[in-house]
């Protein structure tokens, strides 16, 4: 999972100064930071707050999901995408993974007081069970782009579009049938654990290059 922390600026809460953690580039990784990461991965979960990235908090257990072939936590997903958007200065709204997963699962009760974002594009990391998929909403074009790292978009497409239309109706939007869902060509996940990492790279590629074939 080293790729996840590339250019990911973590802000430690304890005695450590702010630093850019670039684990994918080992020559640039200082020995001090290397020891810090290794010590964190070996330790037991304590619930300690380790880093703050924008509005997102990363705990020791969050960063431990970066180790080996573990599934990425929602805090890591949200924090990384926040940095991607912030770094590129795209006019994009990040719908945090908890809210996005509730919305596209049709669980609207917790969304009644949600403030409708002003940005035209929404980046939505969605977790169904133990699998991450990426939904990108284009408000003005009335289009949804669905990317499943496994390449099984057909499993989710009707559910995603149906729940999005229902969400809009709940918010008072009447002309929801104009909305369409699209997919795009991309390479597929080859294992059982890298869906979160691929979601992050797909999102980063899309923001950089638009609707071209996504490859990793």
List PLM regions with ranges.
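Cysteine protease catalytic domains with a Cys-His-Asp triad
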Residues: 1-133, 137-144, 149, 153
């Amino acid at each position: 999972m080293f790729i996840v922390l590339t250019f990911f600026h973590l802000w430690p809460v304890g005695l450590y100064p702010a630093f850019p953690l670039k684990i994918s580039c080992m020559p640039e990784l200082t020995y001090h930071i290397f020891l810090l990461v290794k010590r964190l991965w070996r330790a037991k979960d304590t619930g300690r707050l380790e880093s703050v990235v924008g509005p997102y908090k990363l705990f020791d257990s969050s960063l431990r999901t970066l180790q080996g072939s573990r599934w990425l936590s929602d805090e890591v997903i949200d924090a990384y995408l926040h940095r991607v958007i912030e770094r590129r200065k795209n006019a994009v709204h990040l719908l945090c993974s908890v809210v996005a997963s509730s919305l596209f699962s049709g669980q609207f009760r917790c969304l009644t007081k949600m403030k409708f974002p002003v940005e035209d594009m929404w980046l939505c990391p969605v977790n169904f069970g133990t699998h991450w998929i990426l939904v990108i909403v284009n408000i003005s074009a009335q289009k949804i782009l669905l990317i499943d790292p496994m390449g099984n978009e057909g499993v989710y497409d009707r559910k995603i579009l149906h729940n999005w239309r229902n969400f809009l109706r709940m918010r008072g939007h009447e002309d929801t049938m104009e909305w369409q869902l699209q997919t795009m060509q991309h390479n597929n996940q080859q294992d059982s654990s890298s869906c979160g990492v691929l979601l992050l790279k797909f999102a980063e590629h899309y923001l950089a290059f638009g609707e071209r074939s996504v490859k990793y």
